[in-house]
Amino acid sequence: MAYSSGFNPHPRISYANASPTSAASEAEYLELGLSDRCDPAKVGAALDEVLGPGLDVVEVAEVLPGAASLNDLLAASAWRIELGQSDPEALASAVGQLLSRDELVVQRMTKTGLRDFDVRGAIVELRVTPEGALLFLGRHEVPLVRPDDVVTALRLLVPGLGGERPAMLTRLGQGVVAEPHAAGTLVDPFSGELAQLF
């Protein structure tokens, strides 16, 4: 493991686009700085040994000099959002209303105070499944629109949508939006291949 320099060295670990607190995820990424070149498979196996149940290393890749940064490769996320007791027709109506707008601003409290987020501007795709869940594909823009901001926007359009309980959020994948965009897909950050996420 490589460490930072200075009076208080710490491990060189950076998390790219960490998901919000309480969200589940199938696609979290981190970069580790190592002091020596190591076999990626051995690094993955060593991490798997010490991670808790439910935290699995799926893939490890070596970053070569001059390669794109992880943040550049993770420019969008695909999410499944479950609101609970939602009428699929009301949900579809709210989605239609949101997608028909050029802008829909919600507010969220951040460390620096109340901040505005244009939910509509970040949406690449938003649709309702037959089971009444939402599938949301959004760009990682500044400021970052999170899936709970999408829920807030939908509840502004249709008050009481899904009841009062917090939505269950699951990140399905991260990558880059291909142009032209194919529904439910992102470019995989490791392989560069188009990945079907929903």
Label each region the model flagged.
Residues 40-51, 90-101, 149-153:
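Short amphipathic alpha-helices in soluble, non-transmembrane regions
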Residues 1, 51-56, 159-163:
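Short secondary-structure junctions
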Residues 3-35, 64-65:
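Short, charge-patterned binding micro-sites
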Residues 26-80:
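Ordered, amphipathic secondary-structure segments that act as subunit-interaction surfaces
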Residues 100-198:
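Core RNA-modification/binding signature centered on pseudouridine synthases
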Residues 35-40, 86-88, 140-143:
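Helix N-cap motif at beta-to-alpha junctions
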Residues 10-19, 60-68, 112-128:
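Short amphipathic beta-strand starts and helix->beta connectors
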Residues 79-115:
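A contiguous pocket-lining binding segment that forms or flanks enzyme active sites
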